[in-house]
Amino acid sequence: MRIVVIGATGNVGTSVLEALARRDAVTSILGLARRVPSASYPKTTFAAADVSRDDLVPHLRGADCAIHLAWLIQPSRDRELLWRTNVLGSTRVFGAVAEAGVPALVYASSIGVYSPGPKQRVDESWPREGVPSSWYAQHKAEVERRLDRFEEGHPDRRVVRLRPALIMKADAAESVRRLFFGPFLPSPLVRPGRLPFVPHIPGAIVQVVHSHDVGEAYALAATGEARGPFNVAAEPELDGRRLGAAIGARAVTVPAPLARALAAATWRLRLQPTSPDWLDLALGVPLLDWTRAREELGWAPTRTAEDTVRELLTGLAAGASSDTPPLRGGDRAGEIKAGVGGRPV
């Protein structure tokens, strides 16, 4: 099999490359990214391509499967650029897959696609309108609607959608810091056992999953015969109290309105890059039931949610990074100069 991975150099993309390379059925991998990395991966060659403007068809011709991962989270202050890359760029990918005759497409959706609901497990049939106030959720929901139309127009193509929870690994620590915490995070203090407290925001319950496990899910989807949507998450779900217990920190209750006001103020002041609607997302989305992934993909996580968070925090404290542009070590002065959340990561 020849597989093209679009958005191959980030947190998820690098894990997907590693998982694909372990499979005998995969003979070659083409990794597409805005910036070609100096790092090398088995069976993989890289090419530069921007989903928002470049011709993707030549890269996709002859592929047995395309995995579309490319997505921008920053700059959070430029919603037009985010829409152009995430929604219009995904639409261009789907069109290129059709024109190039690629028989299978695996798309990186998200827990964020789901409509608000109670904090209970839902399967893949839950409504997909996203949290109304979250730009991320609205982009994910719109792309899935466009993918619906792609499937209707191309019933001969095998389409898979993975809807994972929050994805983490140590090598992506500096990337996660730039995306969500910014240049003023006192990284050495977030090591498990050193962090004095974490906020417990009633109603904010999240799921996480290790990037390597997500990479395995994509490899299973790409090389198998499965179709349709699959939730992907690890156990257990985490609130502030459970998170605090996992990392040896005291959980301090912070009401959701106060937490949102603090997030909004610090974002407006450019002290951190995460807009307050991310808290709306954490409060609004339901929890994922990943039974279908286990039964039809043969997938299961190999790491617990607590272990994954501990690994990320240890990586944050150490400044862990990797040799691709999205995962590189941080340029905190450059982040400040760009306005904290003012440029792509």
Task: Identify the meaning behind each predicted range.
Residues 185-237:
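Alpha-helical substrate-binding/gating segment
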